[in-house]
Amino acid sequence: MHELASNVQEQAGSFKDADALNIAFRFWRPAGEARATVVIVPGFNAHSGYYSWVAEQLVAERLAVYAIDLRGRGKSEGERFYVDDFADYVSDIAPLVDLVKSRETGLPVFLLGHSAGGVAACLYALDHQQTLRGLICESFAYELPAPGFALSAIKGLSHVAPHAHVLHLKNEDFSRDPKVVQAMNADPLIAQESQPAETLAALIRADELLKQSFARFTLPILILHGTADKAAKASGSQHFYETAGSADKTLKLYEGGFHDLLNDTGKSEVMGDITRWIDAHLTT
């Protein structure tokens, strides 16, 4: 999952965010001139290192790739896995996009967000639609597989014990590839990952905000979801597609696909759909 072709070099960088936290990212560039850039925002049980194979495929298409570790995740500073407002994640994404635009002068920027990272990416995109050529939302964590009373209980708990870790997602639910699951189980950056009550409450609040904002989207959107996703309901992506204001929007559902489509057994099909969509939006 983390292996790269010999001609694709993974590099690391960092910057200080608005709260003076050191935010880590990885990047990959083609040897020659890039046609565009893709900024990746990972979700829960993940970090920028999980996108090496994705980067290899995109670099082969002459695309520069930058993947962030949001605060408290991967190699970034901050309380582990904690955030009290997804606006803080947006404030991590914004300077990375600015950095990318300054480094990759004049190139179109596509934003790809996975799961809760897709929620953060959507929030960023809402207020930066002129900055982006397109938004790719994979396994959107908009509708969670929990009853309403459980979500209300989490919001209530967040007021009493915001830092209590209350949700541990099963790595087995992310991919049908046993090698991917084995690597996740052995990864010290996520091996003990569980989500604090406040992080989950912040996700719920962000989803509620987006529900009122989908009609504001005008930029091109590609929405991807697996039908067997146990961590986020595919119906949430369906709702996003149906209510987004964008005239240019596409929904792709993958039969039997698990939560991390780009590390699942059908990843080549998903990657092909992404690269073809990007190509189409570089020629229009």
Question: What positions do the PLM features span?
Answer:
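Catalytic nucleophile-loop/oxyanion-hole region of alpha/beta-hydrolase
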Residues: 45-48, 74-104, 270
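Alpha/beta-hydrolase-fold enzymes
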Residues: 114-195
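Alpha/beta-hydrolase fold nucleophile elbow
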Residues: 104-115
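N-terminal cap/lid segment of alpha/beta-hydrolase-fold proteins
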Residues: 1-32
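Conserved alpha/beta-hydrolase "acid-adjacent" motif
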Residues: 230-236
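Conserved alpha/beta-hydrolase
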Residues: 50, 55-78
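Catalytic active-site module of serine/aspartate enzymes centered on a nucleophile-bearing elbow/loop
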Residues: 255-284
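Short beta-strand/loop motif that positions the catalytic acidic residue
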Residues: 217, 223-225, 229
